[in-house]
């Protein structure tokens, strides 16, 4: 059987998930306005889709430049479930692909999480109306399930970055000096000026 490479660029494309009809793949990608390969700056992971027949990739704007990972199609192919930390905690959200309506599926004190920042932590069971997700609580990771039946409350999307300032947790500071963390915080350190 033939292997076909669908994305052929510098972007980090992760966590592919097939649509029920097999025509589209949703995935997570660092495509976005904040990605600049010359300055080595990268957008937070966003949702994206690729049309398998044409190779056309499009990003799906949801909450701005925050984490959007682990996309999973609903049974009808008209909704996409994903994990985002748009308010400082990673929770599961549902995006209607028809009208762009966004609903919160979970609202957990500790958030939905895998073992690492980008680890998949949620799965939609085809034909069952159930999702499973992992939560770190009581000093352990646990798997929970939730029924997806019924209406979910729509959430307000904050468009203006200044209005989001109070919605995120403050950044953590390293306990001790880290040269690597210092370099990573300033992507232009050690690079030649752009006009050379």
Predicted feature residues:
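Conserved beta-strand position repeated across blades of beta-propeller domains
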Residues: 17, 72-74, 123
